[in-house]
């Protein structure tokens, strides 16, 4: 629950603590996604999903991601559900296919990213109303 600060302010504090302090060569910037500074309240992070190469391209990523969205909606009723997506995947439209409805280039701003962090991520997110709309769409399409 981020009632006292925004997602962007939280990143400025926590990303530095988690990634820069143990990796002194890393340098966190302060030009994070603009929308992150307006996100407050109950916020759920949707992490990475990795599929074996032979399981890709069959709609499984979309189905599993949407299932995660719906479970989070039912369990936590978040104000926002967000993820960080590689720029090339965001520009290919992967986020819209799985259910994200809002996109902002440059999620977190790294001047020098730690080795295991992508420096080109986009903030992708949905509001609670977006998630409710996604649930209605899934139900309507499932009944056809």
Regions picked out by a protein language model, each given a short descriptive name:
Residues 1:
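Conserved beta-strand in the GNAT
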Residues 7-108, 114:
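Acyl-donor binding region in acyl/amide transferases
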Residues 89-144:
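Charge-rich, low-complexity intrinsically disordered segments
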């Amino acid at each position: 629950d981020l009632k006292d600060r925004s997602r962007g302010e939280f990143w400025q504090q926590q990303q530095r603590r988690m990634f820069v302090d143990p990796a002194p060569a890393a340098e966190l910037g302060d030009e994070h996604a603009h929308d992150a500074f307006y996100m407050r309240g109950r916020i759920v992070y949707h992490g990475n999903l990795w599929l074996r190469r032979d399981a890709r391209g069959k709609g499984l990523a979309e189905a599993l991601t949407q299932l995660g969205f719906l479970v989070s909606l039912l369990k936590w009723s978040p104000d926002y559900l967000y993820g960080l997506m590689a720029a090339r995947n965001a520009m290919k439209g992967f986020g819209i296919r799985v259910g994200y409805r809002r996109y902002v280039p440059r999620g977190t701003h790294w001047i020098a990213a730690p080795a295991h962090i992508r420096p080109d991520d986009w903030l992708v997110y949905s509001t609670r109303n977006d998630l409710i709309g996604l649930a209605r769409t899934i139900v309507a399409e499932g009944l056809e």
